[in-house]
């Protein structure tokens, strides 16, 4: 569950002229784009930075009262950690920032944190139920536009171990409490179900069959 995200508007892609920059050693020619945040990112300055920190503090207070403990996963993982999300997902196929490091390992910046939390659970084997919360930036190479950005911050919770519908209800209730604490009043809560793993697999197959004849006419 990730109830909040922060990011920025698109940046102009036009090539800017170079200019001289005076430094302590020598003058160097640096293109203007060097002095702008990369496309799909931004600098979060005060007072926005203070508002974001306050939002995280409220979230931490709400979920900690229900027994959730903070986990801080690394910002990059072995790419296989995220490939387990599913090869058919846009995140895996088109949106991951992945690279080979100097040791020859395939690494990816995290596009979300659920997979990292599950990996941490498998590695450290904490007592169950393990109730974890997190906050921090994620990275996706997607088309930068208003409301969707290449670096964005999230807060969220995961519960690992039990298969209990009460856990689902608890997480939904925590989301509601969080929005209330933020002073949001016009919030509508809609609850649905994605079905079982078998249901989802059949649904994906049906969608592929339905759209396969028109693939050339579909946008990415």
Located regions from the model:
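TRNA-recognition modules of translation machinery and tRNA-sensing kinases, especially anticodon-binding
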Residues: 7-220
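Cysteine-centered metal-binding/redox modules
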Residues: 4
């Amino acid at each position: 569950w990730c109830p909040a995200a922060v990011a920025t508007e698109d940046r102009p892609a036009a090539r800017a002229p170079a200019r001289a920059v005076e430094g302590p050693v020598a003058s160097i020619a640096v293109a203007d784009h060097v002095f702008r945040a990369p496309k799909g990112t931004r600098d979060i300055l005060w007072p926005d930075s203070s508002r974001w920190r306050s939002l995280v503090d409220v979230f931490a207070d709400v979920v900690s009262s229900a027994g959730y403990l903070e986990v801080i996963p690394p910002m990059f993982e072995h790419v296989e950690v995220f490939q387990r999300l599913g090869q058919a997902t846009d995140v895996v196929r088109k949106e991951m920032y992945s690279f080979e490091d100097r040791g020859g390992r395939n690494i990816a910046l995290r596009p979300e944190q659920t997979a990292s939390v599950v990996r941490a659970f498998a590695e450290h084997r904490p007592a169950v139920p393990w109730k974890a919360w997190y906050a921090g930036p994620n990275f996706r190479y997607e088309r930068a536009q208003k409301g969707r950005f290449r670096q964005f911050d999230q807060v969220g919770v995961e519960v690992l171990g039990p298969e209990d519908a009460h856990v689902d209800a608890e997480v939904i209730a925590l989301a509601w409490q969080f929005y209330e604490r933020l002073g949001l009043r016009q919030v509508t809560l809609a609850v649905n179900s994605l079905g079982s793993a078998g249901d989802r697999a059949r649904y994906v197959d049906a969608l592929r069959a339905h759209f396969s004849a028109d693939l050339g006419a579909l946008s990415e």
